Structure formats: C-alpha cells, structure tokens
Amino acid sequence: MTSLSESDAGSSARPTMRHVAKLAGVAVKTVSRVVNGEPNVAPETARRVLDAARALDYQPDPHAGNLRRSDRRTRTLGLLVSSVDNPFAGAVHRAVEDVAVEHGVAVFASSLDDDPEREREAVAAFLRRRVDGLILTTASTNQAYLEPELRRGTPVVFVDREPRGVETDAVVSDNFGGAARAAEHLLARGHRRFAYLGDLHSLQTARHRRRGFLEALDHAGIPVADVPVIEDLHDPERAREALLRLLDGPNPPTAVFSSQNLVTVGALRALRERGRHRDTALVGFDDVELADLLEPGLTVVAQHPEDLGRIAAERVFAKLNGDGSPSQRIVVSTTLIARGSGEIPPSGM
C-alpha cells in the first residue's frame, strides 16, 4: 500500500474515503464500492481497501449525502448511559436532552447494561453517525480506544464514572464522601453491627462507595474485617436474598448500607419480609421513587443526576464552541436525606 503522511491523514480530523483511497492505492470510487458492499471489486483490491480503513480507523458516514453545511456538523450528540432500567440513568438522559434542545441538537442515546463490549459497540455506532460530541458512562476498565477520536477534536465528556487511559472531562458524584456520610449518620445513632450491600465490584462508583463507607467505620474504631460486605448485587432480587441470609444468621446487623437504588429496593423487601423494617436501620445510596411514602420513610444519600447530565452537556457544547481549557474533573456533591429508616437506633437503646 502507498504510504500516507500525517498531514495527508489529517491528524486533527476524521479520515475520509480520500485518505483510505490514497493509502490503498485505489480510486475513491473503489473505496465507496467496498464500503457499500457493491459487486465488481477484485478480492485483493477489497482486502487492500479494508486494511487501509482499519489502519486509519476510518468509519463510514451514513449521512454523508446530508452534510453540506460549511461547519460539517451533524447537530447530534451520542449519549451512553448505564441502564434504562435505572431511574438515575433516565434523569441523566433527560438533563442532557434539555441542554441539547436549547442548542438545537438531537441526542442519540443507548444503554450499556454495564457491559464493556456493549460500550465499545455503542460508541462505534455513534461515531458512524458522525455525532458532534460524546457523553459517556463507561463499564470497561480502559477507554484508551477513544484516543484517536480525541486527537481529531471530538468533544468527549464522561458522566458518573471517570475514564482511564484518556485525558478528558469527567462529571461525577461524590461517591466516597456520600458513603462516608452514611456511615457517620448510622454511627451517630449508636450502631456497631453493620452490613454493606454493594453493586458490581467492577464498577468504579461501587468501589468508591465501599471504600468511603468502610473507611468511616474504621476511623470510628469499628473492626471492618467483621463487617459483612456482599457485592455484585446488581438487581433487587439478589440484594433481597443476600440480606435475608444475614438477617437469618446468628449475628444480624442492626444497620444496613445499600450502595445503589436497585439494591436498596431488594434490601427493603428483605426487611419487610422478616418484619425487621422498624428495628433495623437502612440507608441507601441514590434516591428511590416514593421513598418518602414508605413507613418508615427511606433515608438516602441522594445523588443529583440532573446536575450531572446538565454539566456534562454544557461541557460538550463549550468544547464545540472552542473552549480549549485543560481537562476538568467536576465533582457534584450528594445530599443525605433523613426520612426515618436511617434514624432507627439499635435494639436496647
């Protein structure tokens, strides 16, 4: 294949068919035929074109015929959230869309269900659509695969979870501090027997919450090695079963911290199933719909997903408008809302 200089490849722009054609030593029309799966292309020629496309990280543009504006923007964003089952993700999505609408921009959204492979597939789909910017919640352990896109100048902002392997903006909750505050709240009520119910350990947010909760207990003199820590409880049923086992054990906790809203739902069901919802304290991370209507009301460390989504979207548009400031890590504070379940004292007090 023909060699291609950095200036030819346009290091600050996405590769085009022209770049692929030059590297493969063929006509642009030949590249178009290969990309579109048209017949009458020799197998060896098609192989050279595909090899060149891979080498340049070329992504076909399904809307190329519609791109005639001088700025070449599609007026779209790609948004990747954790799971459509989780109200938190829905609130982030809504906030991003509210900002995008103000700018006359549409949002393509997808959920990853905390699957690293799905993350990369969704991002690739967004890039094929030539979105102007990306707002991403991640599940994979490294996002270095986005480096070529960042070099081309595509604005990328991470929301809820920080990236690894790339330097760019991230907007996150104070997961460590919020979990520590939950522990301090329960300690202040006199509790000494705790249980921790955690989300997937592979998730950065879950690890930060676990660390915040356990370090606060440790600072208060609680032997954390004796605290039951049960993780990878990603849905209500697993959380329910885990807490039932603890409640039925020889030394049940007097206070429970659940590190995610769906886990909290399972914990609530277990406590009510055993008739322990009035004598076992519970604090959840993330608010739960109708939490104030329960009896007792549910005490939570509330995140502010609407702020996370809004700030992330504002950062993308700032970058699109020429903001070249260094990468920022923006931490959004959490709020402990006391409604009753977290204020239950241990039996005998």
Q: Residue ranges of each PLM-predicted region?
A:
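N-terminal helix-turn-helix DNA-binding module of bacterial transcription factors
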Residues: M1-R73, E343-P346
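Short beta-strand segments enriched in small/hydrophobic residues
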Residues: L23, V28-R33, R68-D85, H185, ...
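Amphipathic helical "hinge" segments at domain boundaries
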Residues: Y58-A125, R130-G133, L214
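Hinge/beta->alpha junction and helix N-cap segments in small-molecule ligand-binding domains
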Residues: V81-A91, A109-R118, R161, A170-R181, ...
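Short helix-capping segments at alpha-helix termini
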Residues: E102-H103, R152, L217-V224, G249-P252, ...
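Short beta-strand-centered segments that line the small-molecule binding cleft or hinge
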Residues: R120-G177
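Periplasmic-binding protein-like
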Residues: R130-T138, A195-L197, V229, P250-Q260, ...
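Flexible loop/turn connectors
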Residues: G249-M349
